[in-house]
Design a protein with these regions (language model features):
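Juxtamembrane or sensor-core-proximal signal-transducing alpha helices
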Residues: 141-154, 177-190, 200-232
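N-terminal, Lys/Arg-enriched amphipathic/low-complexity engagement segments
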Residues: 40-44, 48-50
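Interfacial loop-to-helix junctions that mark the boundaries of transmembrane helices
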Residues: 1, 122-127, 190-195
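Hydrophobic transmembrane alpha-helical segments in integral membrane proteins
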Residues: 1-14
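Juxtamembrane segments at transmembrane-helix boundaries
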Residues: 15-37, 50-166, 171, 177-185
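Small-residue-rich transmembrane alpha-helices that serve as helix-helix interface/gating elements
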Residues: 130-134, 193-203
Length: 236
């Protein structure tokens, strides 16, 4: 059980790594892909042994489990900023949105785990992680499309206003949800689950709608520019 939980504590980082990489996939050179893989792995290996030591010494707690997820997420977010350069606000937005998605997904996993029941804390963490991973796999296509639609279209154009308006929204929502429930909490009541789902869905819908509106505005501007150019070319 110790090895299984240690492995799951490491694998739980994979969803955020994948989702934050998706929007920038076409803009990462083969050299930088290798650098990302190196640093991701360099972070996962010591984390595995740290988790194994924590579990073997009987120090595994809900606080450590959650803090470990968050700390690795922050460190690898910094790695992304340093390697995939020129997209700082885009990375911060991706960090917040993916953290919110994973937090929401695993909150559902926690609630289901509570309903199933478990003996020791380690058993509950294993079950929660497995359920969370299963939900992530089920919804991965939708999560991926969300990241592609809210980030990717605005990387190659002058979208400074867009990122100035949106980059902090998912981070603020994620932190407000995290701090309101606390790192030490494991038990999830139905009311807590509903509040997390509503907070997460509201943030996702808001970011998606802002992206849609901004995309439409850019299309109108481009159309007006083409019409203006066409009009100028037809003048005697």
């Amino acid at each position: 059980m110790e090895l299984i939980l240690s492995l799951l504590c490491v694998l739980v980082h994979i969803p955020t790594l994948m989702l934050r990489y998706v929007p920038f996939k076409e803009r990462v050179s083969s050299k930088n892909k290798k650098r990302l893989i190196f640093w991701y792995t360099a972070g996962l290996i010591p984390d595995f042994f740290l988790c194994l030591w924590i579990i073997k010494t009987g120090r595994m707690t809900v606080t450590f489990y959650k803090f470990n997820m968050l700390f690795y997420c922050v460190i690898m977010g910094i790695v992304n900023i340093l390697i995939i350069k020129g997209y700082t606000k885009e990375h911060l937005f991706s960090f917040g949105l993916t953290a919110l998605i994973v937090w929401l997904t695993f909150a559902i996993g926690v609630y289901i785990t509570e309903q199933i029941g478990y003996g020791m804390l380690n058993e509950g963490l294993i079950l929660e992680t497995i359920i969370g991973f299963t939900l992530y796999i089920i919804f991965y296509h939708w999560y991926r499309n969300l990241m592609r639609k809210t980030v990717t279209p605005f990387l190659d154009i002058d979208s400074e206003d867009y990122w100035n308006n949106i980059w902090f929204i998912p981070i603020a929502m994620f932190l407000s949800g995290l701090l309101s429930h606390g790192l030490e909490e494991y038990t999830a009541t139905v009311h807590q689950l509903i509040s997390r789902i509503l907070l997460g869905m509201a943030t996702i819908v808001l970011c998606h709608r802002i992206a849609q509106d901004y995309r439409k505005m850019l299309e109108k501007i481009q159309l007006n520019q083409r019409l203006k150019c066409k009009k100028n070319t037809t003048l005697p």
